[in-house]
From Swiss-Prot:
The gene is alaS. Keywords: Aminoacyl-tRNA synthetase, ATP-binding, Cytoplasm, Ligase, Metal-binding, Nucleotide-binding, Protein biosynthesis, RNA-binding, tRNA-binding, Zinc. It comes from Haemophilus influenzae (strain 86-028NP). Consists of three domains; the N-terminal catalytic domain, the editing domain and the C-terminal C-Ala domain. The editing domain removes incorrectly charged amino acids, while the C-Ala domain, along with tRNA(Ala), serves as a bridge to cooperatively bring together the editing and aminoacylation centers thus stimulating deacylation of misacylated tRNAs. Belongs to the class-II aminoacyl-tRNA synthetase family. This is Alanine--tRNA ligase. It is an enzyme of class 6 (ligase). It is found in: Cytoplasm. Pfam families: DHHA1, tRNA-synt_2c, tRNA_SAD. Its cofactor is Zn(2+). Catalyzes the attachment of alanine to tRNA(Ala) in a two-step reaction: alanine is first activated by ATP to form Ala-AMP and then transferred to the acceptor end of tRNA(Ala). Also edits incorrectly charged Ser-tRNA(Ala) and Gly-tRNA(Ala) via its editing domain. The keyword Nucleotide-binding applies.
Length: 874
């Protein structure tokens, strides 16, 4: 019996023997395709080839493409674990022809691979096929050339309500390449319910689609007209998990070797014994998508791809919780995943440490709110009477406890309860509206500025040039002219001003001509034109007028130093921390630079010092900052780093600094690294799970920062009557002295409190014959309060003591109950009741319990509540 890894390799070997180029699986993050959330089909990486926008050195290709369907149009998340064939992650085996072979060869290749004893050797009588209703060519190839009996060839027409809307007609979109397809089905046998495709019972599990062969032969125009393509192509896809299930003689994908191993390992880690539990299926599926997404550069976050990843991780963690997992478990599956994926696991293995760390951190973060969120959900579900959970509750779980909607839906599904999603959407929209109102943005010119043509950028070599005004925008509208005092956006035919991009701020400066001055405060790009944003301070401007465009050269220069320093920092981080470090965002201004990057753990002070030292070494090396224009493939072959999420054209600008840094970048840079002068890190911290941020200054700004630090040190030393060299020692002495005095003071407070014990006994009130002391004592630590309570219990013999103390703006609560009363009065119950009044919680033994709180203004109320409760319960 073939393993899944062997099947994957045999597919690639077969098509390689037929003259196909074996192409590596592309990233799960689609390159240069903003229309896709994740790679979800084998043809994604060849989309531009099919559209005629890209050419490859081969006309036949084959791949084993990793895919994710867990967001957007193709969203299988809610069904994963509950059906035999739904997954968030799967592998699509495919062969492709770019204007080479067509229907005859495509069908013959598929049949040979499936049925030949040399390859898969499936019984021919087990295979059924479908064709598009009018595709006589494909029908005849199957029937007359291949020899499939007519009764096992099914014509499928337009079964989705409109022309060419059919299971057997594929289209890339509303317009563009499209064509009929033929699908191959495997018959599992009459012991399983279900009918052949096109029958009323087609949704059963007896007949399973294993291969789809698409014939791209038309170009659909906007009016619906179908034009024949001059060079028809072929796009095929076969699910690796599905064909593995067929060859391994199982009916569910979750029973194939890969999943059996992952399920067994999950059960071992969490201590589960029932290997058929659906939660084990969910976790085994989710570790594949999560590990590969992280390996491909996705970081858990609250938006976009990162939020889909977070949703999948949290769903897996919740199912681990259902299985009884007591500690972080999800990341422990990564080594097993790498092992079972064989050759296809190499990308995860290369980044294994980072993948495991991010999964562990995300699980630990969610574990803090999971229990509280589930308690709230359980309580809400227990009160549901009409089978519908309110959208308000679902939104609170999302907003407060980090529960994605589909996780809440998962819990509800287990109890046959649905969610009022319309109410959830209303709450979400209301939150967006509040956020927009709070932001108080002015005019959004992104939706207003529409100008034909483009602005020619001259700023790489110039800071001043003559330019013609092609458009003016004022108060959100296109205008012909502007007057003094008006804030506007000026569009120029050409400009030396750099428009904000790649993290670098837009240039400032001014536009001028005879008697006219327009102060440019910022420059932004709107489509292909540059908008110069600012205020007219003298004269008037009109469309068609020529102006001098003059950039603030000093600000530009300082910005360029920071941008070049950012590249050096990126390279230094990767050298010292590891190649898992990739840029996640940046802000480059004239004042400072800010750099966000993937890093799962905190950076030590020693590492930070090493990073700073390395950057300064490369500055002193005085490398030339070299610029080259080349095609994207040549740039990558040269080792240039492409930034995650950036879209690049055919030609790219490559920035090289010696043998240390090479990146794709369109920004403004120093001429040599030595121009930067000095690099100084001023802050480093975490900004999100798995993402760190460094802020730094360079050049004169770095010198000014160091001068200010020196001034602070000198002033501090003067205050302590020390010098800078012995300042640390002086502060340590002062701290030691302060601690000693504080300890002596606390001792005096405790002594005074103990001496007051007899006064407390005298002031005890009787409630139904039981002595009760409920008092506020300020400035006393919890430890001292416990000593006092124990002493008073001995003095009273029988009674209840409840003390509240305010210390450093925090509330300390201690409750003691003598042993003869614990059957009726529990110290933990009473202290929790008091803690609720001061914004805290606590617990302990029936005879002694403690709590803390953050609302000292409510201490009197806590004492009163304790007295009232004791009056009621004694």
């Amino acid at each position: 019996m073939k393993t899944t890894a062997e099947i994957r390799q045999s597919f690639l070997d077969f098509f390689h023997s037929k003259g196909h180029q074996v192409v590596e699986s592309s990233s799960l993050v689609p390159e240069n395709d903003p229309t896709l959330l994740f790679t979800n089909a084998g043809m994604n990486q060849f989309k531009d080839v099919f559209l005629g926008m890209d050419k490859r050195p081969y006309s036949r290709a084959t791949t084993a493409q990793r895919c994710v369907r867990a967001g957007g149009k193709h969203n299988d998340l809610e069904n994963v674990g509950y059906t035999a064939r739904h997954h968030t992650f799967f592998e699509m085996l495919g062969n492709f022809s770019f204007g080479d072979y067509f229907k005859q060869d495509a069908i013959n290749f598929a049949w040979e691979y499936l049925t030949s004893p040399q390859w898969l050797g499936l019984p021919k009588e087990k295979l059924w096929v479908t064709v598009y209703e009018t595709d006589d060519e494909a029908y005849n190839i199957w029937n007359k050339d291949v020899g499939v009996p007519a009764e096992r060839i099914i014509r499928i027409g337009d079964n989705k309500g409109s022309p060419y809307a059919s299971d057997n007609f594929w289209a890339m979109g509303d317009t563009g390449p499209c064509g009929p397809c033929t699908e191959i089905f495997y018959d599992h046998g009459d012991h399983i319910w279900g009918g052949p495709p096109g029958s009323p019972e087609e949704d059963g599990d007896r007949y399973i689609e294993i291969w789809n062969v698409v014939f791209m032969q038309f170009n659909r125009l906007a009016d619906g007209t179908m034009e024949k393509l001059p060079r028809p192509s072929v796009d095929t896809g076969m699910g690796l998990e599905r064909i593995s299930a067929v060859l391994q003689h199982v009916n569910s994908n979750y029973e194939i070797d890969i999943f059996k191993t992952l399920i067994a390992k999950t059960a071992e880690i969490v201590g589960a014994t029932d290997l058929t539990n659906k939660s084990l299926r969910v976790i085994a599926d989710h570790i594949r998508s999560c590990a590969y997404l992280i390996a491909d550069g996705v970081i858990p976050s609250n938006e976009g791809r990162g939020y889909v990843l977070r949703r999948i991780i949290r769903r897996a963690v919740r199912h681990g919780h259902l299985l009884g997992a007591k500690e972080s478990f999800f990341y422990k599956l990564v080594p097993t995943l790498i092992e079972v994926m064989a050759e296809a696991g190499k990308d995860v293995k290369a980044k294994q440490t980072n993948v495991e760390k991010l999964l562990r951190l995300e699980e630990e973060q969610f574990a803090r709110t999971l229990e509280r969120g589930l308690s709230l959900l359980d309580e809400a579900l227990s009160q549901v009477k009409d089978g519908i959970l309110s959208g308000e509750v679902a939104f609170k779980l999302y907003d407060t406890y980090g529960f994605p909607l589909d996780l809440t839906a998962d819990v509800c599904r287990e109890r046959n309860i649905t969610i009022d999603e319309q109410a959830f959407d209303r709450e979400m929209e209301a939150q967006r509206t509040r956020a927009q109102a709070a932001s108080q943005f002015g005019v959004d010119y992104n939706s207003v500025i529409r100008v034909d043509g483009e602005t020619k950028f001259e700023g790489y070599t110039e800071v001043e040039s003559q330019a013609k005004i092609t458009a003016l925008f004022y108060d959100g509208k296109s205008v012909e002219s502007i007057e003094v005092g008006q804030s506007a956006v000026v569009i120029l035919e050409n400009t030396p001003f750099y428009a904000e991009s790649g993290g670098q701020i837009g240039d400032s400066g001014y536009l001028s001509t005879q008697g006219v001055t327009f102060n440019v405060k910022d420059t932004q790009k709107y489509g292909q034109v540059f908008g110069h944003i600012g205020e007219l301070t003298q004269g008037s401007l009109k469309v068609g007028q020529s102006v001098n465009a003059i950039v603030d050269a000093k600000r530009r220069h300082n910005t360029s130093l920071n941008h070049s320093a950012t590249h050096l920092l990126h390279a230094a981080l990767r050298q010292i921390l590891g190649l898992h470090v990739v840029q996640k965002g940046s802000l480059v201004s004239d004042k400072a630079l800010r750099f966000d990057f993937a890093q799962p753990e905190a950076i030590t002070k020693e590492q930070l010092s090493e990073i700073e030292t390395l950057v300064n070494q490369k500055i002193r090396a005085n490398f030339p900052v070299q610029t080259d224009i080349m095609d994207i493939d040549s740039a990558k072959a040269k080792g240039a780093m492409a930034l995650f999420g950036e879209k690049y054209g055919d030609k790219v600008r490559v920035l090289t600094m010696g043998d240390f840094s090479i990146e794709l970048c369109g920004g403004i840079h120093a001429k040599r690294t030595g121009d930067i002068g000095l690099f100084k890190i001023i802050t480093e911290n975490a900004v999100a799970a798995g993402i760190r941020r460094i802020e730094a200054v360079t050049g004169q700004n770095a010198i000014d920062w160091l001068h200010n630090q020196q001034r602070i040190l000198t002033q501090s030393a003067d205050l302590l009557k020390s010098d800078v060299n012995t300042l640390v020692e002086k502060i340590q002495q002062l701290q030691d002295k302060t601690k000693k005095v504080e300890k002596e003071l606390q001792g005096l407070k405790e002594k005074a409190a103990m001496q007051a014990g007899s006064d407390f006994v005298k002031s005890a009130v009787k409630i139904n014959g039981v002595s009760v002391i409920a008092q506020q004592l300020d400035g006393i630590e919890t430890k001292s309060l416990r000593v006092m309570v124990d002493d008073l219990k001995n003095q009273l013999g029988s009674g209840v003591i409840a003390f509240a103390s305010i210390l450093d703006e925090k509330v300390n609560l201690v409750v003691g109950v003598t042993n003869d009363l614990t059957a009726k009065i529990k110290a933990g119950e009473l202290v929790n009741l008091m803690a609720q009044q001061v914004g805290g919680k606590g617990g302990g033994r029936p005879d002694m319990a403690m709590a803390g709180g953050s609302q000292p203004e409510n201490v009197a109320q806590a004492i009163k509540v304790a007295q009232d409760w004791l009056n009621k319960n004694l």
